[in-house]
């Protein structure tokens, strides 16, 4: 996967560069394998984003300064200044991160909610998922909480996967962690559908998920009650492109081998030994 990201990044692909910065910073491989962080590689792509004047690069710089990543000295105060800049430029991940800081450090719940709302309005599923929890626990607004979880799932991502898991519980007979929805009747069709969507995004113990899936047709095939479901399997909620990919995923190993053979990416640029600890 690193080879594929590097190949896309060499063409200026924004999402691939974002993934590489985070990957080289945290050292978490897609299969769960841990690697030693690669500060010089993370710094390379951080500087690329800054040179391109990307708003998201301000968030990467916040992360580097606040945590001492990518070869930067630990400087939380300066890091927070770049986080605020990213927030002002409308970066939803930055808005979400600052909302968490206002929550945990300052207990300023009103500012937290305003920031989460800003990120949610841009389709950031993690913010929708968190805002759903706020509506449910702080205000007891189950209708709005349910809608936010549903919206988060439509946009995919880890936030969408977590929302799908919660929705599975909402429509199960045993509500588990979602006991505030005790009055919601069990619905086996919806429960199974949300479970299928959660596995696609988050994976299982033996198969990795794909958080990049989105479900633009979710409202058509799996609308919230009282509307009836038209569920015909996960493909019915996906775009045609995602459905084709889900049914016949490409051979990533073969793609990576071809990229290396063509010299688009050099082997030494992607070789990364796992940590032994």
Regions found by a protein language model. Name each.
Residues 184-238, 242:
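Extracytoplasmic and endomembrane cell-envelope/extracellular-matrix remodeling and assembly machinery
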Residues 217-277:
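Long C-terminal extensions of eukaryotic subunits of large macromolecular complexes
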Residues 7-8, 47-49, 85-86, 116-119, ...:
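Canonical positions in the second alpha-helix
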Residues 2-3, 31-45, 71-82, 105-115, ...:
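Structural signature of tandem alpha-helical TPR/SEL1-like repeats
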Residues 32-35, 48-52, 60-89, 94-107:
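Extended amphipathic alpha-helical coiled-coil/heptad-repeat regions
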Residues 118, 146-158, 168-176, 181-205:
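TPR/TPR-like (Sel1-like) alpha-helical repeat modules
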Residues 10-15, 20, 27-28, 51-56, ...:
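Short helix-capping/linker turns of helical repeat alpha-solenoids
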């Amino acid at each position: 996967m690193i080879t594929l990201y590097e190949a896309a990044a060499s063409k200026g692909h924004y999402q691939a560069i974002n993934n590489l910065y985070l990957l080289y910073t945290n050292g978490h491989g897609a299969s769960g394998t841990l690697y030693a962080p690669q500060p010089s590689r993370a710094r390379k792509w951080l500087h690329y984003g800054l040179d391109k004047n990307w708003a998201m690069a301000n968030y990467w710089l916040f992360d580097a300064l606040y945590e001492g990543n990518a070869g930067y000295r630990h400087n939380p105060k300066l890091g927070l200044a770049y986080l605020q800049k990213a927030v002002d430029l409308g970066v939803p991940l930055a808005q979400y991160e600052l909302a968490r800081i206002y929550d945990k450090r300052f207990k300023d719940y009103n500012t937290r909610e305003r920031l989460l709302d800003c990120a949610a309005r841009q389709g950031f599923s993690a913010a929708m998922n968190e805002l759903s929890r706020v509506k449910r626990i702080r205000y007891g607004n189950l209708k709005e909480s349910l809608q936010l979880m549903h919206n988060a799932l439509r946009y995919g991502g880890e936030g969408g996967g977590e929302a799908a898991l919660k929705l599975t519980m909402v429509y199960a007979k045993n509500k588990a962690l979602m006991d505030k929805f005790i009055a919601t009747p069990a619905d086996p069709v919806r429960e199974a559908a949300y479970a299928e969507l959660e596995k696609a995004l988050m994976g299982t113990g033996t198969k990795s998920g794909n958080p990049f899936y989105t479900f633009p047709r979710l409202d058509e095939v799996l609308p919230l009650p009282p509307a009836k479901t038209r569920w015909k399997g996960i493909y019915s909620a996906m775009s045609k492109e995602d459905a084709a990919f889900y049914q016949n995923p490409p051979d990533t190993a073969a793609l990576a081998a071809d990229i290396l053979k063509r010299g688009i990416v050099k082997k030494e640029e992607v070789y990364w030994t796992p940590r032994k600890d």
